[in-house]
Amino acid sequence: IKVKEALYNQILESKGDKVNVETSDATYLGLPIAEAAKFFTPDEKNFDFEKLDADYLNKADSDELQILLNSAFSREEVDAIQDICRNWRSVNKRFAGEMISAIDLSRPKSQHIDIMLHYMQPNEVKELYERTDSEMQGLMHHAANASRVKDDFRTSLDTLTHCLSGDDVEEIMLTKDIRGNIPATITDEAAIIAMDYFKENPELVAKMLVNREDFGAGILFDTSEIKVLEKAFEVLKNNPDELADILMLCNANGDTAYTYHKEMGHSKEIKNALEEKITELAVDSDLSVKESISLLEINELHPQIANYLRYQK
């Protein structure tokens, strides 16, 4: 179904809350605006955004704004967002608050956000990133989604770190959704990108790796990709204490990442990599003897080495 461009003009000109919609197949009389908007197709430029006036934007109710904004965000071109922000802000300095509350957080891409930020105050930028949807997911969770992570996540990280303070960035990156996932645990690829991006901040990477302790798991439990382990070990190579803590983290069943992967048998490669790293930390790192023994015992590895270390105390 294709909608004629006249529909948008009808919406603007309508004095009530109902419009007539004429499609190639039929004519629909007296449809509520929300219903009329359903005839819009994402790949069609049915809205003439350049003709949007600030008066309309400030009179529209929240449902109309949501339809308008999300229709714009669903498109590849960014001109629509530019026009909405410029026209709206011209008479309403608090337009960002309305926009933040109206948008579907799964829609905006990094290029959309870049444009919006030019029209926002710092506190509004923080509010934008802190907002979550019904699944408790924010913009960074959605940017890490499997369908977008390759093209959007790293760019979104650039924008996030450019606009917010270090403490605010950490808060956003450690925000959990309803399932306990932070942005870096949405996909294996997101985990690799996030750890590489923050490699100069190993303390934050360590926090991301243990972020689900209250849910009984973490990135190293969930992953099926050896590259996730390799990146974690690389970033934390000079932080043996933090890495040991991560490798001693237990889920609700009392399993560490190593014993979990050993029991599940999903990946022998991951199990072997974990065993190798645990052993290396225990015998060839700056861990104390007590920490080394605890690391081996909780992972049920090499009791003979643990006994040897015990006699060295």
Which role does the model predict for each range below?
Residues 1-3, 13, 293, 298, ...:
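Non-Sec secretion/translocation targeting segments of pathogen effectors
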Residues 4, 43, 78-84, 109-120, ...:
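Ankyrin repeat structural motif
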Residues 17-19, 287:
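Charged, low-complexity interaction regions
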Residues 19, 56-57, 88-96, 122-132, ...:
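Ankyrin repeat arrays, specifically the small/polar loop and inter-repeat linker segments at the C-terminal end
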Residues 25-27, 63-69, 94-104, 131-144, ...:
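Ankyrin-repeat boundary/"N-cap" motif
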Residues 29, 33, 112-116, 183, ...:
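Amphipathic alpha-helical elements of HEAT/ARM-like alpha-solenoid repeat scaffolds that form extended
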Residues 71-72, 102-109, 142-148, 185-189, ...:
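Ankyrin repeat A-helix N-terminal signature
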Residues 254-275, 285, 293-298:
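Leucine-rich solenoid repeat scaffolds
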